[in-house]
Amino acid sequence: MFLVDDLLVNPFLSLLDILHTMALDEMNDMEEIRDEIKENQLLYEIGERSETDYQQRKQQLEARLETAERIQAQMQGRIEVKR
């Protein structure tokens, strides 16, 4: 009975793990967040963004980057999906 469960359930769980890893990678792309930080800085420097908006966005992006770094550290050694 357990052998049949292993044969039927393990591939499904493995697929879910891969999909979960891919979703986390996509949601927490550190390079994309860094680009957004640079864009925010540039918009502020050329005067298209107020200092208040700049500071708020900067805090949001830095928090997102910190979260992404934490998630990536936790995901080390897990399944690596190559694109």
Swiss-Prot record:
**Main subcellular localization, coarse class?**
other
Q: Which residues form a coiled coil?
A: none
Of the GO CC terms on this record, one is: gas vesicle
Pfam families, alphabetized: GvpG
In which compartments does the protein localize? Gas vesicle
What triggers production of this protein?
A: Transcribed from early-log phase, decreases as cells enter stationary phase, probably as a long gvpF-gvpM RNA. Highly expressed in 25% salt, poorly expressed in 15% salt, no gas vesicles are formed at 15% salt.
- Keywords per UniProt: Gas vesicle
NCBIfam families in alphabetical order: gas_vesic_GvpG (NF045779)
The record's comment on protein family reads: Belongs to the gas vesicle GvpG family.
Please give the name of this protein: Gas vesicle protein G
What organism is recorded for this protein? Answer: Haloferax mediterranei (strain ATCC 33500 / DSM 1411 / JCM 8866 / NBRC 14739 / NCIMB 2177 / R-4) (Halobacterium mediterranei)
High-level lineage? Archaea, Methanobacteriati, Methanobacteriota, Stenosarchaea group, Halobacteria
Q: Name the gene for this chain.
A: gvpG
